[in-house]
Amino acid sequence: MAPKSKKAPSKKKMTKAERLRLMQEEEERRLKEEEEARLKFEKEEQERLEIQRIEREKWNLLEKKDLERRSQELEELALLEGCFPEAEKQKREIRALAQWKHYTECDGSPDPWVAQEMNTFISLWEEEKNQAFEQVMEKSKLVLSLIEKVKLILLETPTYELDHRTVLQHQGSILRLQELLSLKINVATELLLRQASNLADLDTGNMEKIIKDENVTLYVWANLKKNPRHRSVRFSETQIGFEIPRILATSNVALRLLHTRYDHITPLFPIAVTEQNQNPVGAEQVNVEESTEKAMTEEKLFTEEKAANEDEQPKAEQERELNLVQEENKYEAIENTVLQRTSDSEGEDSQTTQLELEMKLLSEAVLAAQLCLVENVVELPEASQAYKVDLCHFSTLGGVYHLDVLELPPQCKPVKGWVLVEILQEGLQRFIYPPDTTEEPDPDVTFPPIEVTLEIHKSVIFFERPRVVRWDNEGKFWRSDGISSVYYNREDRLLTFSMDTLGPVTLIQDAHVNMPYQSWEMSPCGMNKVLLIVKTVFMELQIYIKENLCMLASVKLRGKGLEFHLKGKWMAPIPFILALKEAGLNIFPAVYSHFYVVINNKVPQVELKAYRQMALLSSAFSFGWSKWNMVCNSTRVVIRVREQLSEETEHHTWSLLMFSGDRAQMLKMQEENDKFSEALREGTEFHSTLYHMMKDFASPVAMERVRHSNCQFIDSVCYMLLSIRVLSYS
């Protein structure tokens, strides 16, 4: 029999008093914890407020210190920024020297500055008749050079030195040269086509000719046999040509493809001229000279009057007081010497004042011109038609392809040792295709489009598939309709498309395809030389800036280096920018670019001050892109900065610098931080300029290099920064 299980001991029941005691202990513990938490919070809050008070006092002290020395720092900055008007003065001298050099060379070419010489050159060329195509191409080198020189005059000469009449004269010279060159090419084409029968190919019986130089390439084909089966026209050793319909294959026509590397069709953009600021320096100079001459004239009259009064003294008195007269003569000589010295001193002071006034006015004019480079227009011009190409959004590249179906002129005929030719008074005529007719169209007769194959020149880079547009001669604009079946062979750079009616065509690309930039960096490469690197979605550009010249050092497309014709060529900033734009490497925003690009907009005055002061420091300090520049508002910029004396020297660590135009400060945070903070870096202060901010921790060698930088170099660096606008378009 199994033993009985023992009963579990019964749990002792808690009394009411014990329950009350436990509840009381729990309440006391809760109150104690709450009190401890309250005391801890109050202590932490007091500590936080104390830290804030100390920081605020420190901040106020730094602000007070900054305000006390602001006037002194701005005066020092003004002395350093005197390099900008000095650089402009040197550029004036360079322009004057270039004119003098042209005058002394006597090479027969006109001076582009002198409208009369340009008019004479144009008139003489108009009188030259029946020039062969090779002669026209040779002459075109000089003509294109003159056009580029006149364009550079309009672009490089400050607007305050250009009056409206001069601008119109130069623009008129450009248009007349462009029109005359086009006319000469047409006449030369007509002369060539008159000899088509003599130049016919033995195999096909048709004439084919290719003439090319560095500016122009002519492809011309004359349909002499009128073979209806010969509808594919391909120029020898190329894939360039036409696919023509039967009606053209049986007509007395010629096909011309004239590729000009230049664009003389797109209208010139107007040059802004400020009438009220025309030559302010010269006007002030005249006023100063007039006042100086007036003062010197009054002094001269006073001296002459005094001398006349002395001559009228009675001789008797002079005889009686001979000794006194001798003493007076002695004192008079001393007085004249003092007057002469005073006059010389006043003349020197007047010249000094005049020079200071001239430089001050020039400095203000330069500052205003620089500010225009970073200002944006408020409204965008409205497009009148949907098919009209917006030249604010797109840019033409690769020149112009003039596609023409021409009526074959009467051929030369040899008769008894003579060459007879019928010369048409109307000259070279275009064959109308499709024909204009007022009658009802015949449904059995069709006019299919003409297929064209072009080769894109290697001097142009397209980051997207190029778009083909045609010229509207009546409306004077590029239009995108009337072109179909576009195919682009990227490897062979061949573009095939069809057109209803042949005419001038060009290729366009989004002008802002490389904006905004992904990053940028500017580093010194020794004295008066920097390397500016700009990275975009498609490419990386490396640009050297040395004194008053720029050079394309490297082009990388999707990480791969590219051999390019512009590499290694030193050019002045404006021609350099134009060359990059014409090559498709556009990193230069226009005043309307902000309508097409999402930008990090900055106040123009802040942006301008930053670029000017970065240029002043560029010989000894590197500057770079910071992601925090997007975080701060439009009144401040954030950049990375470090001292760097050359490419070989050991690099310092990057620091973050914030600048508002009136105050510069080093930030405590680093580029890698997750949150933006305006806290000051330990041991740093506020300053009114970037120069004085960097001076606090820079080496003496670096600051010495900054103070002795070349003014042309500083001006060129500033101009490139203003043109690329790395702070707003990155």
Curated annotation (Swiss-Prot):
Keyword Ubl conjugation among UniProt keywords: yes
Give the highest taxon in the source lineage.
Eukaryota
Supply the alphabetized keyword list. Cell projection, Cytoplasm, Ubl conjugation
**Calcium among keywords:** no
**InterPro entries in the record, alphabetically?**
IC97/Casc1_N, IC97/Dnai7-like
Tissue distribution is: High expressed in lung, kidney, and testis.
Region: Disordered, residue numbers: 1-20
Post-translational modification here is noted as: Ubiquitinated. Ubiquitination leads to its degradation through the 26S proteasome. Ubiquitin-proteasome-mediated DNAI7 degradation occurs in mitosis.
- Protein's GO biological process: microtubule sliding
Show the ranges annotated as biased composition (Basic residues): 1-14
- Where is the protein localized? Cell projection, Cilium; Cytoplasm
**What phenotype has been reported when the gene encoding this protein is knocked out?**
Deficient mice display a higher susceptibility to chemical induction of lung tumors.
Instruction: State any single GO MF term.
Output: alpha-tubulin binding
Function of this protein? Via its association with the multisubunit axonemal dynein complex, is potentially involved in the regulation of cilia function. May also act as a cell cycle regulator.
Q: Report the sequence similarity comment from the record.
A: Belongs to the DNAI7 family.
Q: What is said about its interaction partners and assembly?
A: Part of the multisubunit axonemal dynein complex formed at least of two heavy chains and a number of intermediate and light chains. Interacts with tubulin. Associates with microtubule.
Q: Mind telling me what this protein is named?
A: Dynein axonemal intermediate chain 7
Q: Provide the taxonomic classification.
A: Eukaryota, Metazoa, Chordata, Craniata, Vertebrata
